[in-house]
Amino acid sequence: MRILILPLMALLASCSSAPLPPDVPPSYSEPPAVATDGFVSVTTSADIPLSIEDLRAFLLDTPFITFLEPTDTISPPIAEETLIGEWLSAGAVRRLQLEDGHYVIERVLENRPELFSYQAWVFTNAAARGVDHIYGVQRFIELGLKETRFEWTYNVKPKSALTAIFVGRQVPELTEFMNTGTQAMAAAAGATANVE
């Protein structure tokens, strides 16, 4: 019995430890098809006293990723490199370098005034063990002439039913990460409305 337990314990220990950042950034690889179900999803939102057009212009000048703050296990992006196309155009691909030295590759799926969606599928951090891909959606909902609801949904597609359990355990921290970034962006964007 001991012969079986020791390798199992070693395997579990290796799975729980965080991988080291790569020496070389990952290259582009073909993305999987975007799933239609089986996601673990988190949504956050904020109402901002700007029109959709003005809010989108603000985010063009000040990219949303600049408002993301680290949590205990989630590292925010600190740099980006466009690999294919022109970022924000459908089909464009970029590589994000995270604060902890890891990388994520993502692509634009759709970009309209009221909706921006993207897919992330290359991860060099621990997410690679349990996450197949992420389908992100940012909606811009008109509430009035000068008010927009920004709604951000993060749909995480686990690799299996087993990894879905572990992904589900990350929901509170993912919620904190998303809420903090969304509220910081909303405050900064809202402040521009007061100087118009």
Region roles according to the model:
Residues 120-176:
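Beta-strand/loop substructures that line and gate deep hydrophobic ligand-binding cavities in soluble
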Residues 1-4:
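Positively charged n-region of N-terminal signal peptides that target proteins for export
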Residues 12-14:
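C-terminal motif of bacterial Sec signal peptides marking the signal peptidase cleavage site
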Residues 38-40, 88, 100, 132, ...:
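Residue-level preference for beta-strand/loop junctions
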Residues 67, 77-129, 183-196:
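Glycine-rich portal/gate segments that line the openings of hydrophobic small-molecule binding cavities
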Residues 44-46, 104-110, 134-142:
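Hydrophobic/aromatic beta-strand elements that line small-molecule binding cavities or substrate pockets
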Residues 53, 57, 176-179, 183:
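Solvent-exposed, polar/charged alpha-helical surfaces in well-ordered, non-transmembrane soluble domains
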Residues 16-83:
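Hydrophobic ligand-binding cavity/cleft-lining segments
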